Amino acid sequence: LRGRYVSNVYDEGLSDQEILVHIGLDDIDSHFGGCTTHLSYLIVKELLKTLNVEFIDYPNLVRLNPSIPFKTRGNGAVALRLKTFRSNIKLLVKTLTDMTLKYLSEYEVSVGSDPGIALVFGDVPKELSKLYMKALTDYVHRDYLLNILNKLDNIETPLGISRGVIGALAAIGWPQGSDCTYELLAYRVLRGVGERCVDKDSVKNADLKYSEYIFNNYDHEEDVLLITPHSNDPV
């Protein structure tokens, strides 16, 4: 399905006005490589370098229903929230789109994935909060998404209306200020992809020492390292 375009955001007569922008990304990975959080990191880095933007929150890594059969790994989508001037929107959308397409090609994200990006301009509509809850606890049919898109006029989907747009908009709909945890992610370059060199004992000792603050790093009963991913993604 063709993407949606929000024409009034590009009104040149309002170019000096600030606007709130929420960016959602999902399904930017496959069993062979890529990672939605990694692309999000690259986008944040590029926007800070080339555009006059002010992020209003940390990137939100939003976990959705883990039982969905379409998931590639952990079924997590990302929302980025920022303020910028309307005059920057055209370049922002182009940068976001170009970087996503380049990433999909570079990391061969195709088989089993249906990548989606979405932008919400202004306040987050209550319909997206409902979408988040449904995506967390249930299965979201594409018709449900289309009903939302037909109601709202502040959502743009530059890559089309893919399955990934469901997760992207659900991440945007996550209620800001809710209880959360924090993840510290480290990424490797493509030439470093292979077996991860992580010292098992160091993770085990750190997990014991800081058990009051961290979790799911090590399975002490099975003596198994949990902190490292098992796929070819850049994490």
What do these predicted ranges mean?
Residues 1-235:
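Conserved mixed alpha/beta catalytic, RNA-binding, or beta-rich assembly cores of soluble enzyme
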